Amino acid sequence: MNSMADTDRVNLTPIQRASEKSVQYHLKQVIGRGSYGVVYKAINKHTDQVVAIKEVVYENDEELNDIMAEISLLKNLNHNNIVKYHGFIRKSYELYILLEYCANGSLRRLISRSSTGLSENESKTYVTQTLLGLKYLHGEGVIHRDIKAANILLSADNTVKLADFGVSTIVNSSALTLAGTLNWMAPEILGNRGASTLSDIWSLGATVVEMLTKNPPYHNLTDANIYYAVENDTYYPPSSFSEPLKDFLSKCFVKNMYKRPTADQLLKHVWINSTENVKVDKLNKFKEDFTDADYHWDADFQEEKLNISPSKFSLAAAPAAWAENNQELDLMPPTESQLLSQLKSSSKPLTDLHVLFSVCSLENIADTIIECLSRTTVDKRLITAFGSIFVYDTQHNHSRLRLKFIAMGGIPLIIKFEHLAKEFVIDYPQTLIECGIMYPPNFASLKTPKYILELVYRFYDLTSTAFWCRWCFKHLDISLLLNNIHERRAQSILLKLSSYAPWSFEKILPSLIDSKLKKKILISPQITYVVFKSINYMITTNDDKIHKSAIPSSSSLPLSSSPTRNSPVNSVQSPSRSPVHSLMATRPSSPMRHKSISNFPHLTISSKSRLLIELPEGFFTWLTSFFVDMAQIKDLSVLKYFTKLCYLTVHINSTFLNDLLDNDAFFAFIRNIDTIIPFIDDAKTAAFIWKQITAICVEMSLDMDQMSASLFSTAMNFIRKKNNTSISGLEIILNCLHFTLRNVNDDVAPTVGSSESHSVFLIKVNNDAAIELPIDQLVDLFYALNDDDVNLSKLISIFTKICSLPGFENLTINIIFHPNFYEKIVSFFDTYFNSLLIQIDLLKFIKLIFSKSLLKLYDYTGQPDPIKQTEPNRRNKATVFKLRAILVQITEFLNNNWNKDVPKRNSNQVGGDSVLICQLCEDIRSLSKKGSLQKVSSVTAAIGSSPTKDERSNLRSSKDKSDGFSVPITTFQT
């Protein structure tokens, strides 16, 4: 039986030193394996006490000093919920740490036995004990650094024992990351900002989630996305959790570690102290005893499949369990030569690998394998046996044999044997690639998708991007890539190809939109995110010609795109070529327009590029089929790239706009977005999503071939938000109004008028139906915009166009009679004192709304019409006086605004020498004088009612000369 005798250096606690002079331990079975080494169950020969002995491998004195410093701290810890430290045994390059044996294994094992996880009441006992242990540790200045269910052990009576703090973290911190501890790590640790005792509180919260759901937060994300989620996202617990528990978790998951509660504070939390079905006083009845119960160590704690870096030294093999069994059966162990001879034989394969590694040197094992693989023909049974040896080496021997095999030049011999090569793919891909596994005949022999994708992904890091893309074009099976899209490596490869390989648009995209793949795409938000992001890249990088011709343009300002055949810019007369037109006309956007999405290689398409891109057949149908599915996805990253893809699609092919206009699922999707975004903290991404949606809706309103109540209703919802989407909503309303005026015919004549209450405009779409446009909502939007808002110029331009339309005199009157009208106008001029164009736009707007209001309320010679002297018209006369009083007030302000002699005037005021500004001010001033509105040929022309048939004909024939700005057809005294 193996033992650790007193010939080795044994360091004991004071109690042990007082009771015995030497200690000998019998090593029983292996109960754990991990990044740190091996854990054995052992028995003290003198006392029969069962202990756990952890083997820690170190490589140099520096690592040994780190371990010894931690041990010096551990030996002073003494708490019921901390695994007791008994001492250590030091050998050449191993350190054996003697710890308390926990018969019931880890809490992870207990959780795994449940189909759904522990209940809240069950978990409270374990959480409370864990907090007691953390309170003690933190009071001693110790940070655990790796709290999770696998590191919370249970004694024979189910008392919680915190284990694996300090030692394994110091010895191999990178191994912890590889083991998957990212899901439990606090943001300050992931961000390399340093750990504190409060970092353990975050990990405790993740462990509570693990107890109740069997998985930690963000368990379905890749490593890169876990980093992002922990740092930036808010974790929302399942709805089944009680409110006290949700509050408990919210306190654990505070991103600022200095605002997190301590373990002592959490012990006082209402969730911990609620006593329903829980008797907390039972904790005090737990007693420790060391029974020789059957071990219950679970696979999670053993971490049998860790990807760790092995030691550079060829260390002594682990103590052999076979010796104990052989002594009992009175057998002698085989010799090294016997084992190596058996290893070469294909007729009698070696099955006891533990014996092989205990007796034979690593060099001799590696040399024997190389000798066999060098034969002309190699038996398949030998290949299988060698594969098992490498697997055992990885799991139980720190990969020392694999390192020796590489050093002795064995890799070229396994290239043609996938069963052997796969054992090196994950840990040593570069070595395989350097030995020629990516050479086409060798690569073609590989059949396992996981290893193929891993090698292709690693090949990217070792070659140039251009070469890698060309290689993938020739040798990568696209169907294999897409059928394994659930694999992390497949997702990474797809993103890289879509970003850098121009051929991905023609070779990958048609296969990606196959309806058979849709279910796989929707398996998880991560996959959906990758697919939509990749297609965005493919569209914007599919051809070198597009790269050269693409000019960055704003995806949020459709008015800056080339006018379509139905654009109001080409359909409504304007009295003059105005600065409004200059601001609204087509112009190239700044190259920094897409700074917020600078991680995109290219994400804009110029008008020239639109002609070069032809989307695959069925692409639009495939894309729109996701509108219903998006209702189940709350991930903003997915929605961001989905909406961007929708915008790019209709921007490339405007014929899809009318198809989208008839798609009820599209408008339902917008309503669903409206319910999700208010509860998301990522304002930047939310703004980007709305930017794409409103851009699509604006383009739809420009190209629509029929009036859409759904689009109109959506636009009104945008307006009611009173934010950046409101301007787009107003623009859509304007385009809808222009559409009704453009498409008047003799059978159905859509008109714009007002109801008797003057509270709404009725936009008639046919003889039986009309859409209501509330005046008060338009007025509220005008006054809701801040004076310094960057959208002011656009707002004034759109309001000018709407107010100039026939039938909207009531809107102009309501704007003027608003209590804040004068203050708003003064504030506008004060804010934009240095902008000549905006001041001109404001003056034109003022002139328009006063002239239309006066024409509505007054007769057209400046005198009340005696024929209309009814009681309502007498009230109109009082309204006229009120309106003129406001006009006089505005005129006085304008007189002083550019007057250099006024003391309070801004010294940097521009426009005082502008002929156009002077003329506009004079026009506005003249409106306050009687007789200023000359008699015109028709009342309908002056007021701005719907045009006659002849007028409509003239309107359409002159649309190519129009800039979209119209006022009532009248003249003013100047």
From Swiss-Prot:
Listed GO CC annotations: cellular bud neck; cytoplasm; spindle pole; spindle pole body
EC number(s) per entry: 2.7.11.1
Inducing or repressing factors: Constitutively expressed.
Q: Where is the composition biased (Polar residues)?
A: 564-579
User: Where in the sequence does UniProt note compositional bias of the Basic and acidic residues kind?
Assistant: 948-963
**Coiled-coil ranges (or none):** none
Phosphoserine modification sites are: 561, 567
- Ranges for the region named Self association domain are 360-702
Which residues does UniProt mark as catalytic? 146
* Activity regulation info: Kinase activity is inhibited by phosphorylation and activated by dephosphorylation by CDC14.
Disordered as annotated region, ranges: 554-592, 941-974
Query: What does the UniProt PTM comment say about this protein?
Result: Phosphorylation by CDK1 reduces the binding to the mother spindle pole body. The extent of phosphorylation gradually increases during cell-cycle progression until some point during late anaphase/telophase when it is rapidly dephosphorylated by CDC14. Phosphorylation inhibits kinase activity and dephosphorylation by CDC14 activates CDC15.
Principal EC category: transferase
Q: Where does ATP bind?
A: 31-39, 54
Q: Which Gene3D superfamilies match?
A: Transferase(Phosphotransferase) domain 1
- Database matches in InterPro entries: Kinase-like_dom_sf, Prot_kinase_dom, Protein_kinase_ATP_BS, Ser/Thr_kinase_AS, STE20/SPS1-PAK
Q: Where in the cell is it found?
A: Cytoplasm, Cytoskeleton, Spindle pole; Bud neck
Q: Where is this region: Auto-inhibitory domain?
A: 751-974
Q: Which residues form the Protein kinase domain?
A: 25-272
- Record's subunit section: Homodimer. Interacts with TEM1.
**Can you quote the domain comment?**
The region between residues 360 and 702 is essential for function and is required for self-association and for binding to spindle pole bodies.
- Entry's family note: Belongs to the protein kinase superfamily. Ser/Thr protein kinase family.
Q: Relate the protein's function as given in its record.
A: Protein kinase of the mitotic exit network (MEN) essential for late nuclear division in the mitotic cycle. Promotes mitotic exit by phosphorylating DBF2 and directly switching on DBF2 kinase activity. Involved in the localization of DBF2 and DBF20 to the neck which is necessary to undergo cytokinesis. Plays a role in segregation of chromosomes during recovery from spindle checkpoint activation. Required for spindle pole localization of CDK1 and inactivation of CDC2 kinase activity at the end of mitosis. Required for spindle disassembly after meiosis II and plays a role in spore morphogenesis.
Please give the name of this protein: Cell division control protein 15
Query: Native species of this protein?
Result: Saccharomyces cerevisiae (strain ATCC 204508 / S288c) (Baker's yeast)
Point out the gene that encodes the protein: CDC15
